[in-house]
């Protein structure tokens, strides 16, 4: 499990643990993700574009940056008075802290499968 992990994982490790390493990203992927989007930069991007809804995404790690199969997402409303710091806190409290434990539980209980790059929960 990764959270705020800003180090590139070696490709061999990713291949060895395909669909077994998970990450959480503070946006609704595919928006505001990839190279350069981390920490407050994500929320600054959201606010500068006037986005109305953001959130968080738990996904499997692959060779790309925030490109792996999406496990769970949760939306959070963006408020007119938000600062990047306030939005970051709300995304953590209302989304990240909820969906990461849920994703771990689903995986630990064998309820997550990946077929053709898409996650199925059952």
Language-model regions: role of each:
Residues 1-117:
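Donor/substrate-binding cores of folate-linked one-carbon enzymes
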């Amino acid at each position: 499990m990764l959270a705020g992990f800003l180090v590139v994982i070696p490709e061999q490790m990713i291949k060895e643990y395909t669909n077994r390493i998970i990450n959480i990203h503070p946006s609704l992927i595919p928006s505001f993700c990839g190279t350069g989007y981390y920490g407050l930069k994500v929320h600054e991007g959201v606010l500068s574009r006037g986005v109305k809804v953001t959130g968080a995404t738990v996904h499997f790690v692959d060779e790309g940056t925030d490109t792996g199969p999406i496990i769970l997402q949760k939306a959070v409303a963006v408020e007119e008075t938000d600062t990047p710091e306030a939005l970051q806190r709300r995304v953590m409290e209302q989304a990240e802290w909820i969906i990461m434990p849920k994703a771990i539980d689903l995986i630990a209980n064998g309820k997550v499968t990946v077929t053709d790059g898409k996650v199925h929960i059952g």
